[in-house]
């Protein structure tokens, strides 16, 4: 990454931190993955039960591995041997002490957009876990909420779809077709614009490109 890009991300990150705090979120800006991992671990109490959705950004900074190997009660859905066991682990995440998530997009004004297929991730963001910890690269930040919704639908979702064997138009074309496919992964669109209780949702913004 160029020095110009680093400075650009830092300046926008500082603006976003301020705007997130005005909406009662906790927010921190970290210039790189290593400092983001350090900050994230400071925000997770030892011994806490920790679950996560499809948190690719958290995985990329090493947070998922740190939780699995550290002094935490990891709720790892990928450890399930059956579909029923996996479903039970998803439900347990809804009462975890800490839930790790990414963000499909953020507006510079401090609103978060997420799109889900099953809905387990957006459910946990809305209610349940004591703390929601969002790891987001600065590539997710858009100028406006409309831009953020567009990014989530036309960039994040089609890219995320490539991880799954479902049959949707975006698997073939790479572009959103606003489909109603049975396999659609865009069934819930959540806009999180404020935090109550204050500080329940915490953001670690990373001055790198992470996730989709």
Where are these regions (language model features)?
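Iron-sulfur (Fe-S) cluster-binding modules
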Residues: 1-23, 39, 158-166, 171
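Conserved phosphate- and dinucleotide-binding cores of soluble alpha/beta proteins
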Residues: 94-212
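N-terminal start-of-chain detector that recognizes signal peptides
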Residues: 1, 21-24, 71-74, 85-87, ...
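Short, functional N-terminal and low-complexity linear motifs
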Residues: 2-8, 33, 115-117
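Flexible, glycine/proline-enriched loop segments at strand-loop-helix junctions
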Residues: 3-4, 78-80, 132-139
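N-terminal active-site beta-alpha-beta segment that forms phosphate/nucleotide-binding
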Residues: 9-90, 94-99
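Glutamate identity and glutamate-enriched acidic tracts
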Residues: 3, 10, 26, 42, ...
């Amino acid at each position: 990454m160029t020095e110009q890009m680093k400075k650009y991300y830092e300046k926008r990150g500082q603006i976003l931190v301020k705007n997130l705090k005005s909406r009662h979120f906790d927010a921190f800006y970290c210039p790189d993955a290593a400092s983001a991992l350090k900050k994230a671990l400071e925000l997770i109490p030892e011994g806490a039960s920790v679950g996560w959705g499809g948190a690719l950004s958290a995985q990329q900074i090493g947070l998922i591995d740190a939780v699995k190997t550290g002094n935490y009660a990891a709720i790892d859905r990928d450890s399930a041997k059956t579909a029923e066991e996996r479903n039970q682990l998803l439900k347990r995440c809804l009462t975890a002490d800490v839930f790790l998530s990414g963000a499909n997009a953020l507006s510079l004004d401090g609103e978060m957009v997420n799109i889900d297929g099953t809905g387990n991730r957006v459910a946990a963001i809305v209610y349940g876990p004591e703390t929601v910890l969002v790891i987001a690269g600065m590539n997710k930040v858009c100028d406006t909420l409309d831009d953020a919704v567009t990014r989530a639908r036309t960039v994040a979702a089609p890219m995320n779809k490539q991880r799954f064997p479902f049959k949707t138009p975006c698997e073939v074309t790479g572009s959103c077709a606003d489909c109603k496919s049975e396999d659609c992964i865009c069934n819930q669109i959540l806009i999180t614009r404020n935090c109550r209780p204050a500080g329940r949702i915490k953001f670690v913004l990373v001055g790198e490109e992470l996730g989709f």
